[in-house]
Swiss-Prot record:
The keyword Signal does not apply. One of its GO terms (molecular function) is ATP-dependent DNA damage sensor activity. GO terms for biological process: mismatch repair. Belongs to the DNA mismatch repair MutS family. One of its GO terms (cellular component) is cytosol. Transmembrane segments: none annotated. CDD domains: ABC_MutS1 (cd03284). ATP binds at residues 607-614. SUPFAM superfamilies: DNA repair protein MutS, domain I, DNA repair protein MutS, domain II, DNA repair protein MutS, domain III, P-loop containing nucleoside triphosphate hydrolases. This protein is involved in the repair of mismatches in DNA. It is possible that it carries out the mismatch recognition step. This protein has a weak ATPase activity. This is DNA mismatch repair protein MutS. InterPro entries: DNA_mismatch_repair_MutS (IPR005748), DNA_mismatch_repair_MutS-lik_N (IPR007695), DNA_mismatch_repair_MutS/MSH (IPR017261), DNA_mismatch_repair_MutS_C (IPR000432), DNA_mismatch_repair_MutS_clamp (IPR007861), DNA_mismatch_repair_MutS_core (IPR007696), DNA_mismatch_repair_MutS_N (IPR016151), DNA_mismatch_repair_MutS_sf (IPR036187). Pfam families: MutS_I, MutS_II, MutS_III, MutS_IV, MutS_V.
């Protein structure tokens, strides 16, 4: 058996309790890692891997980071989904015999980050927990530890529903029991990209019972208990800022699955995975970090409560009508700090003096914001104004205690104002008077010795000293100066008087700093009493910020207030895609109408690729979402229903992680919509059926349309390249053909991006191929094939190919063979056959480009 050194034994004992985390083991001024941790961390953090004697024949792998710069390395590990256990020395090495005691003081994981540098200002950092009740339902709870938010619900025991909740929240970490982790599929774990943490205890900690209400179900309470236990055990400190758990029902909000949100680019761009080009990016003119976070929550969960939607619309109208007051409101909001996260840091005990200055300055703005809102006539804005608590006593205390120029460090003084504490004033006077005495001493010593360059200085090692250059040391009187330090060109001395004064000054400064830290800690503790009030204030300010953002964006982008229909009808005049319009510019964007009602439930959209079908479909959905979050909408006029759900299938999205083809994903998403949609839902299907053979796809597309028409009655936009489906208008009363128009000018296609009634009269696939610069002979051949198809009832035509010798000459496969003198080469014939068999209308632009590249490579 290996006999390790006592220190390595201690390390291994602690590491055994934190197998799933990197253990940052404090040794002097460094956090060290050993064994497997060292091997992995050295690669991830790109730091030097060394070795240490530990009682074995070979050195133990080791790497480390300085404790004062460890936060950057910790952030890197957390960002990559790892956990870090911080192990500190909990005894003073100077007073301890033998091995210093060490303990893990905090486990930092992706869902428990509290350091500002590891958090994004306008994004929540959610950690969630799960409790499976008899395989029937999930108790689900989540919290943002940095803000104290705590919410819970019960959802169906379905992976799809769980994924929807987790992705809606952009959850960073999920706490499950070992048995629950086994049940969750590996595909789900990989797809979500979140950290899984196993924790078994799920009873509510005694000190947190007040956070749970009686009416909550058992599964909900167990999920909350699991979350609270995990936080308690990993954070090892007071979590007094956690708010009472709020129960929510997913049925109280518009539902959208993960794919729908991604396709519509609500909060994350498909291309760059950032906010740029999303609806959130467009609507976000919030001035505070907490307002930005609330806005994302609103967009993730649009309202279905008519009263609440109208209330927000009224507020936006009122703010738009008071331009100058809104400008004043914006200026005040700019000076409001992140009160939610400040409250969290106060509870954690890691708030500094600068934070308290920001808090005080934020509280200064509250009476001004309140007065501005009260000058308006909106009832709900007045109600919001009256909820604004300026915390006057706290403001006065902070004004009285904290210096405006206070440093970030809380242990070096310079924080507490003069006059706040008489004992502190006494120490400061002693220190200041002493320094005045030092300055006077320097003047007197120069006069006494005649050395004009003599100076009195100070450093932390030697304290106060008198410095004289080597050239002038002979001028010093003998017996009075005691040499303290020799430099290259000077000598440093002390005198009995200087030594005595030094003690008085340093004692006063040390006592002053100790007392300042004590006084600051008392102020910080006092702020804890206001955490709940500050959190309520933060919510009200965030809501005001979101509403002013809606007003500002609506005004700048010429949005109008929509009317909510009672009969489920949708009528949008000159509607626009808000994000595309912003990117292109209002002058370039082509607006379009959209009308849906009980007699016109399905719009079948035809038209060429690149013509704007997908953009049109998305703009209808985004208009509905804008309305249901309470914002105005991009149109000249809009009457909109309240949709309970939106389902989308737009774009080719092979699920590579899950190993599912485009067609399988199409069918799964189609099933999801068909099974769960109601008459109050909106369905957007873009080219359903293109992922399989032509007739299969056409048959499925027709069957899906008929099923929605006969059984679901949801408002539906269905785009297709199957022109044959346009005949359904004659059979299905609630289906209407529309198309995206295009014209030919000088043999070229011009896409007008304008929606018109009726089916498209022809396709423009060959023109698109021409734009892609396929060989001219190939384009001509495709045109002849198309002409023959159109004249011969659309039978599939295959170009003639060279027949095997045993096939008789009279067997003719082509209906229009090449002339003998122009017979194509074997290579050309194969290419022509391949092109003839392609169905360009079923291809996405990316598929087409890939195929063109493949064909060109064969030609060359």
């Amino acid at each position: 058996m290996t006999e390790y050194t006592p220190m390595i034994k201690q390390y291994l004992e602690i590491k055994d309790k934190y197998q799933d985390a990197f253990l940052f083991f404090r040794l002097g001024d460094f956090y060290e890692m050993f064994f497997e941790d060292a091997l992995n961390a050295s690669q991830i953090l790109e730091i030097t891997l060394t070795g240490r004697e530990g009682g074995t024949k070979e050195k133990i792998p080791m790497c480390g980071v300085p404790y004062h710069s460890a936060s950057g390395y910790i952030d890197t590990l957390i960002e990559k989904g790892y956990k870090v256990a911080i192990c500190e020395q909990v005894e003073d090495p100077k007073t301890t015999k033998g091995m210093v005691k060490r303990e893990v003081v905090q486990l930092i994981s992706p869902g428990t980050v509290m350091d500002e540098r590891g958090l994004k200002a306008k994004e929540n950092n959610y950690i969630a927990s799960l409790y499976c009740y008899e395989g029937k339902e999930y108790g689900f709870a989540y919290s943002d530890l940095s803000t104290g938010e705590l919410k819970s619900t019960v959802i169906e025991a379905s992976e799809d529903r769980l994924i929807n909740e987790l992705t809606t929240l952009s959850t960073r970490e999920l706490i499950v029991s070992s048995s629950e982790k086994e049940v969750l599929s590996d595909v789900m774990k990989e797809q979500l990209g979140l950290t899984f943490s196993v924790h078994e205890e799920d009873t509510i900690p005694a000190e947190n019972e007040k956070l749970v209400t009686r009416h909550m179900s058992l599964s909900e309470k167990r999920a909350i208990g699991k979350l609270l236990h995990y936080l308690k055990e990993t954070q090892k400190r007071d979590l007094g800022h956690l708010q009472q758990a709020v129960h929510y029902e997913t049925s109280n909000y518009m539902k959208m699955d993960y794919y729908s949100k991604r396709n519509l680019e609500l909060a994350e761009s498909i291309r760059g995975k950032g906010r740029q080009g999303t609806l959130l990016w467009l609507l976000d003119n919030t001035q505070t970090a907490m307002g930005g976070r609330m806005l994302k929550q609103w967009i993730d969960r649009p309202l279905i409560d008519r009263k609440k939607i109208i209330e927000r619309q009224n507020d936006v109208s009122e703010l738009m009508a008071h331009f100058f007051e809104r400008l004043e409101l914006v200026e005040n909001l700019k000076n409001v700090y992140d009160l939610e996260r400040l409250a969290g840091r106060v509870a954690y005990g890691n708030v500094n003096a600068r934070d308290l200055i920001q808090l005080r300055n934020s509280l200064y703005q509250i009476p001004r914001i309140r007065a501005t809102l009260l000058s308006m006539s909106s009832e709900s804005l007045t109600e919001l104004a009256e909820q604004l608590d300026p915390c006057e006593e706290l403001t006065e205390k902070l004004e009285e205690a904290i210096m405006d120029s206070a440093p970030i460090s809380i242990r070096e003084g310079g924080i507490i104002k003069d006059g706040y504490n008489s004992q502190l004033d006494t120490y400061r006077d002693a220190s200041r008077n002493g320094k005045t005495w030092i300055a006077e001493l320097e003047r007197k010593e120069r006069e006494l010795t005649g050395i004009k360059t003599l100076k009195v200085g100070f450093n932390r090692v030697f304290g106060y000293y008198i410095e004289v250059t080597r050239a002038n040391t002979h001028l010093l009187p003998e017996g009075r100066y005691e040499r303290k330090q020799t430099l290259t060109n000077a000598e440093r001395y002390i005198t009995p008087e200087l030594k005595e004064k030094e003690k008085l000054i340093l004692d006063a400064e040390e006592k002053s700093m100790e007392l300042e830290y004590q006084l600051f800690s008392e102020v910080r503790e006092m702020v804890k009493d206001y955490i709940e009030r500050l959190q309520k204030l933060a919510k009200s300010v965030s809501e005001i910020d979101c509403l002013q953002s809606f007003a500002d964006i609506s005004e700048k982008n010429h949005f109008i207030r929509p009317t909510l229909s009672e009969d489920g009808s949708l009528h949008v005049k000159q509607g626009r895609h808000p994000v595309v319009e912003k990117v292109m510019g209002a002058q370039s964007y082509v607006a379009n109408d959209c009308d849906l009602d009980e007699n016109r439930e399905i719009l079948l959209i035809t038209g060429p690729n690149m013509s704007g079908k997908s953009t049109y479909m998305r703009q209808v959905a985004l208009t509905a979402i804008c309305a249901q979050v309470g914002c105005f909408v991009p149109a000249e006029e809009a009457i909109l229903p309240i949709f309970d759900q939106i389902f989308t299938r737009i774009g080719a999205a092979d699920d590579l992680i899950a190993g599912q083809s485009t067609f399988m994903v199409e069918m799964l998403e189609a099933r999801n919509a068909i099974v769960h949609a109601t008459k109050d839902s909106l369905i957007l299907f873009d080219e359903i059926g293109r992922g399989t053979a032509t007739y299969d796809g056409m048959a499925l597309a027709q069957a899906i349309i008929e099923y929605i028409h006969e059984n679901v009655h949801a408002k539906t936009l269905f785009s297709t390249h199957y022109h044959e489906l346009t005949d359904l208008e004659k059979e299905l009363r609630g289906l209407q053909n529309i198309h995206v128009s295009a014209v030919e000018e000088n043999g070229k296609v011009v896409f007008l991006h304008k929606i018109k009634e009726g089916p498209a009269d022809k396709s423009y696939g060959i023109h698109v191929a021409e734009l892609a610069e396929l060989p001219k002979s190939l384009i001509e051949r495709a045109s002849r094939i198309l002409e023959q198809l159109e004249n011969d009832d659309k039978k599939i035509i295959i170009a003639s190919v060279k027949q095997p010798e045993e096939v008789h000459e009279e067997v003719q496969l082509s209906m229009f063979p090449l002339e003998p003198e122009k017979k194509a080469s074997s290579k050309e014939t194969k290419l022509l056959k391949e092109i003839a068999s392609m169905n360009i209308m079923q291809m996405t632009p990316m598929d087409a480009m890939n195929k063109l590249y493949e064909l060109q490579s064969k030609i060359h």
